[in-house]
């Protein structure tokens, strides 16, 4: 198969050309800027053409040291489109860890988010055997300078040179994309290194394509024009795969922060329909709720009682609607009896659940209303029970 992630993006650009693909903030701004699909693809082509200008070849490794942002995805798609392999890492990595990953992956090009990450890399420049170029993303100046055998330049400079190369070679990136295969290595993601030196995990294009081809039937909520808020690191395969999934369906990705006040303000501002999360985010909300109700013994007992009722109600409802996994198909009689039993349980417990909603959970719902109205939410199962109860 000659199917790759960049090919999938190329196929949908015309379809969603005028829709927003990214919503992002610049600097200390509190307002969101937008980028449409057509402009996104033009920037991808300029980045790829800029890399071709600097002599990158198929199969070379490109390190991306950055937190989640729109440029991350642009660099990723440009790199993969050229048949290269990207090696992502977050800004919290140490100098020694970065040097090890750069050398171990045999990377020749590096993208760093800002000057702080640049200094980390340069502190180990004498140990970097193969590095030829370093690109600084967060720099509004256009510059290029030499430091020994390493060329350092800004993202802005890369775009300028890429635009020139693209005008002279308008088909070069398209030609490289068509050379790609689903069997090509797309990325090398290194483990955290908590039990020793980080280990590189290689993923092919087909690893991502497999997910893209199977998830849409189960997620009908993913539709063009909707907004997904992003708070997880893109250098983790989970967030990266999820962003591919939604972006290829015309959903805008809004970059926020996993910080309570920032996230809640962005929810109010954007009114997103989707979020990809981990239990820790919702655990913070849960702890805040528990802390508040624990101020009084009566509040604590009432809350705890109604929460247990809500969890039982949610489980009964889940089984009745067929959302729970069934490992052995029951016979018809047992299936009918089971549904009847669940239905009676739901009817009996509903008045108590409704009372809890009126007396307790209505007040909790109000500040969380935007979050609880999400159409698509991925978190740990036991935490979702609390959210299901609040939403029902």
List PLM regions with ranges.
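Conserved pre-ATP/AMP-binding loop-to-beta segment of ANL
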Residues: 18-20, 152-153, 163-190, 197, ...
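Short beta-strand->loop structural element characteristic of the AMP-binding/adenylate-forming
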Residues: 63-65, 72, 76, 80-119, ...
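Conserved ATP-dependent adenylate/AMP-binding module captured primarily in the ANL superfamily
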Residues: 93-123, 211-229, 259-274, 367-368
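A short N-terminal helical cap/helix-turn-helix that marks the beginning
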Residues: 1-23, 42
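Conserved AMP-binding/adenylation subdomain of ANL enzymes
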Residues: 209-227, 234-333, 343-362
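Conserved AMP-binding/adenylate-forming core of the ANL superfamily
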Residues: 22-69, 73-77, 94-99, 154-156
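ANL superfamily adenylate-forming
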Residues: 29, 119-180, 289-361
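Conserved AMP-binding A3 loop
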Residues: 34-37, 186-212
């Amino acid at each position: 198969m000659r199917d790759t992630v960049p090919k999938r993006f190329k196929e949908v650009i015309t379809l969603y050309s005028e829709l927003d693909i990214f919503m992002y903030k610049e600097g200390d701004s509190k307002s969101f800027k937008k980028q449409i699909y057509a402009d996104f693809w033009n920037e991808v082509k300029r980045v790829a053409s800029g890399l071709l200008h600097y002599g990158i070849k198929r199969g070379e490794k490109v390190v991306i040291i950055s937190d989640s942002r729109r440029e991350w995805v642009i660099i990723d798609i440009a790199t993969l489109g050229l048949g290269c392999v990207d090696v992502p890492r977050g800004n919290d990595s140490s100098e020694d860890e970065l040097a090890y990953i750069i050398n171990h992956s045999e990377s020749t090009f590096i993208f760093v988010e800002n000057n702080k990450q640049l200094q980390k890399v340069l502190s180990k420049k004498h140990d970097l055997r193969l590095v030829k170029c370093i690109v600084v993303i967060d720099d509004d100046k256009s510059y290029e300078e030499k430091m020994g055998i390493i060329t350092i330049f800004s993202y802005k400079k890369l775009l300028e040179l890429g635009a020139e190369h693209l005008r002279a070679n308008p088909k070069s990136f398209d030609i490289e994309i068509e050379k790609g295969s689903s069997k090509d290595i797309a990325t090398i993601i290194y483990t955290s290194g908590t039990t020793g030196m980080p280990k590189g995990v290689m993923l092919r294009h087909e690893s991502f394509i497999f997910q893209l081809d199977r998830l849409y039937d189960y997620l009908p909520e993913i539709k063009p024009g909707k907004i997904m808020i992003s708070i997880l690191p893109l250098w983790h395969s989970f967030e990266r795969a999820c962003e591919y999934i939604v972006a290829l369906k015309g959903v805008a990705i809004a970059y926020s922060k996993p910080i309570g006040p920032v996230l809640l303000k962005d929810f109010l501002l954007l009114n997103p329909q989707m979020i990809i999360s981990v239990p820790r985010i919702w655990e913070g909300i849960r702890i805040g709720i528990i802390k508040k109700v624990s101020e009084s013994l009566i509040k604590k007992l009432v809350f705890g009682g109604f929460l247990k009722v809500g969890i039982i109600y949610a489980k009964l409802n889940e089984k009745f609607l067929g959302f729970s996994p069934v490992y052995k198909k029951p016979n018809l009689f047992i299936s009918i009896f089971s549904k009847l039993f669940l239905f009676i349980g739901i009817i009996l417990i509903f008045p108590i659940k409704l009372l809890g909603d009126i007396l307790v959970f209505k007040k909790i719902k109000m500040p969380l209303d935007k979050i609880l109205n999400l159409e698509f939410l991925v978190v740990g199962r036991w935490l979702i029970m609390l959210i299901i109860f609040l939403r029902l």
